[in-house]
C-alpha cells in the first residue's frame, strides 16, 4: 500500500550552539532517510534528571544508544495538572485541559448523571480509573469496562459515557487511522481507551491489561510490563498484540511502562538523596525498562525496520518529592472539611490526589470565601497549602469554571513534599501537581540518522503530537487541540526550526536533523 512518509534530512558537520529560522535545509544536497513509523514510549514517572543520570552511568544501555542518535529535550514539561490522563492526552492530542476537557482522572461533571440513576439527577463524579472494570484483579479486567459503572448523559437519551466520548478533541491515532495507517496503543487499564478519540475508532489494536492484577512489588510490576512489551514485539513482527493474526506493522504504536513509577513511590524504593540518585529498587526498575526497550530495538533491526522508525521516549508525568526528607502525608479529608465550614454541603467534589486537590462547589458564587478560608495561615499550615488558585489566577491558566462546567472552582497546590492521601499512607511520592518535580519529564526523540544533541529551550509534551503527525507526513493542524492552542512541533527536528532554540555545543562532525517535504514511499 502506498502511504505518505516523510524524509528527514541531515546537515552533516555543523556545530550549532543556537538554531534559528535562517538555518534551513537544502533538501537537494542533503542525504536523507524516511520515517515510516513512530514508536511512542511513556516511562511513567521519568524525570529529565532520571534519564540523564541513567544514560551517564549506563553508557552501553539501550537508552544511551538511542540518545547517541537522538535529540534530548532537557527542559520538557508535561501537563498541569500532571495526572496520567491529562498527561497522556497532552502527548496524543497536542492540547491541555483547555481543549481536551479532561482535567484529571477524577473530576465532577455538572452536565452528566450518576451511574444507575436513570438520569433523575444531574451532576456526578466521573473517574476514569480501574474502578470501572468488571474485575480489576484480573489481567483482562473481567472483560473490560462495566457499562453499569459509567456516568450517563441526559442530553443524549441517558446513554453511558465511555471514556473516549468524554474527550472533546481528536487524537493522533484518529488522524493516522483516517489516513489509512494502522495504529496501536498499550496502557494500564481499560479506561485508556480514551486515546481512541471521540470516534472511538482511532486505535486499531488497543491492549489495556489491568495493572491491578499485578502483585504490589517491583518484580510483579516488571512482570506486568513484560506482558505489554511482548505485545509490542508481536506488533513489530507484523502481528496483532496477541501474536495471533498477521496484520502488518503499525505506523503509530507504543505503550506506557509502569514499574519505574511504582518503584518511585513504594516505601522500599524512591531516591537516596535530593539529587535523584536511585535506590536499589528504582535502579532495578529502570534497568529492566531499559532492557525492554533494547528488545524492541533489536526486533526492529532484525526486521530491517529500525532505520525508518522514529522512537520517542517521554513520560505522562514525573513524581514528587525526589528528596524523601520533604515527604509528608496530609490527610485528604482536611480540605473538604474546611470548605464545608464555609457553608454546609458546599463541596460537590473535592478530589484530593497526591500533589493537588481540585474542588467543585455546589454554589460557585462561594469560591472567593472558600479561597479566603483556605488561605488563612492556620489552615494553610494544617493542609500543607502553598497556593490557592481561583478566580483570575485560575483563569490565567485554564478555562473559566463559570463558562466550562468541567473546570474546578478552586485548585489547591500543596508545598513540595506534601502529599494528599489517606492518613497513614506509606507512599514516598506522588504526582498530579504543578511543581517542577511533578512536571519536568524526560523527552528523547531518536532515529539512526540523527546526531546526538541536547536542546535546552523549554518545550511542552503537547508538542509531541504535531511532531508525530508531521514525521508521518500528515497535517498537524488536523488535530483540533493543535489548531485551538496553536501548538507547534518540537524545535530542531524540522526544516525551519523554532526561532531562538538553544542547544548544547555539538561534537565535531555532528549535525542537525530537519524534515523536508513529504515524500511518497511504500511502508514496510
PLM segments and residue spans:
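Active-site nucleophile/metal-coordination loop of metallo-enzymes that catalyze phosphate/sulfate
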Residues: 29-35, 48-171, 178, 194, ...
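Acidic, His- and aromatic-enriched active-site or binding-groove loops in soluble protein domains
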Residues: 93-105, 200-241, 275-291, 331-352
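Active-site His/acidic residue clusters
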Residues: 189-212, 239-288, 295, 325-328
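Metal-dependent active-site segment of extracytoplasmic phospho-/sulfohydrolases and closely related
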Residues: 288-330, 391, 468
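Acidic/histidine-rich catalytic neighborhood
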Residues: 307-309, 315-362
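Polar, surface-exposed loop/tail segments
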Residues: 377-407, 474-511, 515
Amino acid at each position: 500500500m502506498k502511504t505518505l512518509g516523510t524524509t528527514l534530512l541531515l546537515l552533516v558537520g555543523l556545530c550549532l550552539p543556537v538554531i534559528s529560522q535562517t538555518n534551513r535545509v537544502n533538501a537537494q544536497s542533503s542525504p536523507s532517510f524516511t520515517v515510516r513509523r513512530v514508536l511512542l514510549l511513556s516511562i511513567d514517572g521519568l524525570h529529565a534528571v532520571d534519564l540523564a543520570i541513567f544514560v551517564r552511568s549506563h553508557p552501553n544501555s539501550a537508552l544511551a544508544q538511542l540518545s547517541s542518535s537522538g535529540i534530548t529535550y532537557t527542559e520538557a514539561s508535561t501537563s498541569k495538572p500532571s495526572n496520567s490522563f491529562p498527561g497522556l492526552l497532552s502527548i496524543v492530542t497536542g492540547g491541555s485541559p483547555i481543549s481536551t476537557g479532561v482535567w484529571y482522572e477524577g473530576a465532577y461533571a455538572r452536565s452528566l448523571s450518576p451511574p444507575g440513576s436513570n438520569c433523575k439527577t444531574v451532576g456526578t463524579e466521573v473517574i476514569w480509573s480501574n474502578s470501572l472494570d468488571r474485575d480489576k484483579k484480573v489481567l483482562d479486567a473481567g472483560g473490560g469496562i462495566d457499562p453499569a459503572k459509567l456516568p450517563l448523559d441526559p442530553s443524549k437519551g441517558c446513554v453511558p459515557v465511555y471514556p473516549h466520548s468524554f474527550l472533546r478533541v481528536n487524537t493522533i491515532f484518529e488522524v493516522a487511522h483516517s489516513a489509512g495507517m494502522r495504529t496501536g496503543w498499550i496502557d494500564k487499564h481499560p479506561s485508556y481507551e480514551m486515546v481512541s478519540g471521540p470516534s472511538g475508532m482511532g486505535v486499531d489494536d488497543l491492549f489495556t491489561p489491568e495493572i491491578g492484577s499485578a502483585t504490589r512489588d517491583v518484580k510483579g510490576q516488571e512482570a506486568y510490563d513484560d506482558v505489554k512489551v511482548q505485545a509490542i514485539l508481536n506488533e513489530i513482527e507484523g502481528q496483532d498484540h496477541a501474536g495471533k493474526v498477521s496484520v502488518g506493522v503499525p505506523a503509530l504504536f507504543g505503550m506506557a511502562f509502569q514499574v519505574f513509577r511504582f518503584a518511585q513511590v513504594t516505601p522500599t524504593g524512591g531516591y537516596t538523596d535530593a539529587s535523584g540518585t536511585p535506590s536499589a529498587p528504582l535502579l532495578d526498575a529502570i534497568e529492566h525498562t531499559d532492557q525492554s526497550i533494547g528488545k524492541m530495538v533489536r526486533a526492529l533491526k532484525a526486521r530491517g525496520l529500525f532505520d525508518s522508525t522514529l522512537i520517542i521516549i517521554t513520560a505522562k508525568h514525573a513524581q514528587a518529592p525526589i528528596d524523601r526528607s520533604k515527604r509528608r502525608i496530609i490527610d485528604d479529608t482536611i480540605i473538604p472539611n474546611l470548605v464545608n465550614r464555609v457553608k454546609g454541603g458546599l463541596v460537590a467534589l473535592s478530589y484530593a490526589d497526591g500533589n493537588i486537590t481540585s474542588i467543585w462547589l455546589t454554589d460557585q458564587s462561594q469560591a472567593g470565601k472558600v479561597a479566603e478560608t483556605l488561605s488563612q495561615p492556620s489552615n494553610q499550615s494544617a493542609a500543607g497549602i502553598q497556593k490557592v488558585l481561583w478566580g483570575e489566577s485560575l483563569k490565567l491558566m485554564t478555562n473559566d469554571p463559570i463558562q466550562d462546567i468541567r473546570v474546578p472552582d478552586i485548585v489547591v497546590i500543596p508545598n513540595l513534599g506534601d502529599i494528599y492521601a489517606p492518613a497513614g499512607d506509606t507512599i514516598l511520592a506522588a504526582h498530579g501537581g504543578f511543581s517542577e518535580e511533578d512536571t519536568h519529564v524526560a523527552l528523547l526523540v531518536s532515529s539512526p540518522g540523527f546526531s546526538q544533541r541536547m536542546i535546552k529551550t523549554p518545550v511542552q509534551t503537547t508538542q509531541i503530537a504535531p511532531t508525530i503527525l508531521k514525521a508521518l507526513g500528515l497535517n498537524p493542524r488536523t488535530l483540533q487541540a493543535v489548531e485551538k492552542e496553536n501548538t507547534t512541533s518540537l524545535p530542531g527536528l524540522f526544516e525551519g526550526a523554532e526561532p531562538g532554540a538553544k542547544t548544547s555545543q555539538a561534537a565535531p562532525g555532528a549535525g542537525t536533523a530537519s524534515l523536508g517535504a513529504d515524500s511518497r514511499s511504500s511502508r514496510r
